[in-house]
Design a protein with these regions (language model features):
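Short capping/connector residues at structural and topological boundaries
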Residues: 52-54, 59, 113, 131, ...
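N-terminal alpha-helical targeting/anchoring segments
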Residues: 45-100
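Acidic low-complexity segments
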Residues: 2-26, 32-46, 90-178
């Protein structure tokens, strides 16, 4: 049985039964050289302040999975935006058909060595501050830019933040998780 590491995005806590999913993956990878089940959730937001006004704000969220089966020189891949046992079962069937090669037993490739380098904090930049705080920050930056020089006629500020959370299920390792928060601020 594979142990689950703590992660804010964990499809086994919300969408799936872990034991059933492992069985589907075992079936999909039977006789394969390599493969995995990759889960992903993305959230992003952006703000545009122009001409002293909030011109645009957007928010989007998506999630899904991909299942990869490698057999000799062939790779079968299937994906879906719906994280469910039914979707994973269909993806497994598709991946197996796509990667089907000559019969015979093969061993799965070993997972890459885990580096455990923490490159980012676990903070979600979207949830870290309120909508009004972000708008106030943009207005403060706008005022600062205009005060730098009286020749400044127009200021455009774009604030974009996102978080990508992934979980990778392989048969030879515990569930692998990563969180990638990003923030971009541009002023022109």
């Amino acid at each position: 049985m594979i142990k689950i590491n703590c992660n804010s995005f964990n499809p086994f806590k919300t969408n799936l039964n872990q034991d059933k999913t492992v069985k589907i993956l075992e079936s999909a990878l039977h006789g394969a050289d390599d493969g995995e089940l990759f889960f992903e959730r993305r959230k992003s937001e952006s703000f545009l302040l122009q001409d002293n006004k909030l011109k645009n704000s957007n928010y989007s969220s998506s999630q899904g999975f991909g299942l990869r089966v490698v057999k000799e020189e062939k790779t079968g891949y299937a994906h879906s935006n719906e994280i469910s046992e039914t979707s994973i079962r269909r993806a497994a069937e598709t991946s197996i058909r796509a990667a089907k090669g000559k019969g015979g037993k093969s061993d799965l490739a070993t997972s890459p060595v885990k580096t455990d380098k923490i490159l980012y904090s676990n903070n979600n930049p979207i949830n870290e501050f309120s909508f009004s705080y972000k708008v106030d920050l943009l207005q403060e930056i706008n005022s600062f830019a205009r005060e730098l020089d009286n020749r400044v006629a127009q200021v455009s500020i774009n604030l974009a933040s996102s978080i990508q959370e992934i979980s990778i299920l392989r048969l030879d390792t515990p569930l692998l998780n990563d969180s990638r928060p990003m923030i971009r601020l541009s002023v022109s």
